[in-house]
């Protein structure tokens, strides 16, 4: 549970904005969406290998220019 202390005379909009910023930093929504669908570890590993190969090809392409 997030606790946001409100200072004396602080605008409620500012306190709400601080709460939203802190909520985003915790990554609760991101984690919830990630857990909604299970992805097999082999699929994750394959995607990581494909991404690494893509990035490597991009870097090699930039070096040749």
Curated annotation (Swiss-Prot):
Keywords: Ribonucleoprotein, Ribosomal protein. GO terms for cellular component: ribonucleoprotein complex; ribosome. One of its GO terms (biological process) is translation. Signal peptide: none annotated. Pfam families: Ribosomal_S21. GO terms for molecular function: structural constituent of ribosome. The keyword Ribosomal protein applies. InterPro entries: Ribosomal_bS21, Ribosomal_bS21_sf. Belongs to the bacterial ribosomal protein bS21 family. NCBIfam families: S21p. This is Small ribosomal subunit protein bS21. It comes from Flavobacterium psychrophilum (strain ATCC 49511 / DSM 21280 / CIP 103535 / JIP02/86).
């Amino acid at each position: 549970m997030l606790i946001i202390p409100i200072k004396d005379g602080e605008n409620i909009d500012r306190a709400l904005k601080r709460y939203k910023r802190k909520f985003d930093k915790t990554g609760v929504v991101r984690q919830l969406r990630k857990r909604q669908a299970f992805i097999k570890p082999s699929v994750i590993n394959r995607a990581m290998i494909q991404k690494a190969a893509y990035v490597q090809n991009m870097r090699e392409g930039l070096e040749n220019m």
